[in-house]
Regions:
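Exposed, interaction-prone extracellular/peripheral surfaces
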Residues: 1-29, 33-215
Length: 215
């Protein structure tokens, strides 16, 4: 098992009881110790606009704690989210067929599905996308007034007026983003799950894994 983790600044977003980074840490811990109980080698790769850390697959409880400590200690990385460098690194470094969990919000300006790198990785390995989402990313708050939004990665900010038209337009952008990702995952092909940070992320992940066993 290889867990590839997005550690860009957008993963720091948290408007519910957990940030996306906290949610992915819980998910990572669950995957690590599940793999350990099944006596499966496990490793991790951390990335933002480049690969920032790599721990090759090993089978030891101490390695699980090392991975979690290194993950939690990683400061938010500057720059935009770019998945292709991580995908290329995984293709190069993983010699044996591996289950790869690609954990990212996929908030990126690059077309990760263009160029075929992800399809090449998925042809050799079992790749599963895990997409954590904060409630603030899926809908604007109710009520009237003005809301200032800031991109955690670029630092750009803008103020919008809260009204029904703005909520409808925002909802349409979210739907288009979901549709684009879903269609891309289908073309690769690869399994995926959108996990909300205001819900039990482990239960959501277990639902995905259980559905894979039934397939």
């Amino acid at each position: 098992v290889m867990i590839a983790l997005d550690v860009s600044r957008s993963m720091e977003l948290g408007t519910s009881h957990a940030s996306k980074k906290e949610a992915l840490t819980v998910i990572t811990a669950s995957l690590l110790f599940s793999a350990l109980s099944d006596q499966v080698n496990v490793g991790f790769l951390a990335f933002a606009d480049r690969v920032v850390d790599f721990h090759p697959p090993r089978r030891a409880r101490a390695d699980c704690w090392t991975i979690l400590e290194r993950l939690w200690a990683l400061a938010p990385q500057p720059g935009p989210t770019m998945l292709k460098p991580a995908v290329r690194a995984l293709s190069t470094r993983l010699r044996r067929s591996t289950v790869v969990f690609l954990v990212s919000d996929f908030m990126t300006d690059e077309d990760v599905f263009d160029g075929g790198e992800l399809s090449v990785l998925a042809a050799k390995h079992d790749v599963i996308a895990v997409v954590p989402e904060d409630p603030a990313e899926t809908a604007l708050p109710t009520g009237l007034g003005y809301l200032r939004l800031r991109d955690l990665e670029s630092g750009r900010a803008k103020t919008i007026e809260l009204n029904q038209d703005a909520r409808t337009a925002y909802g349409e952008q979210v739907r288009q983003h979901h549709d684009s990702l879903t269609q891309g995952f289908y073309r690769v092909p690869m399994d995926y799950a959108f996990l909300r940070t205001d819900e039990n992320s482990v239960e959501q992940l277990m639902t995905l894994l259980a559905s894979r066993l039934k397939a």
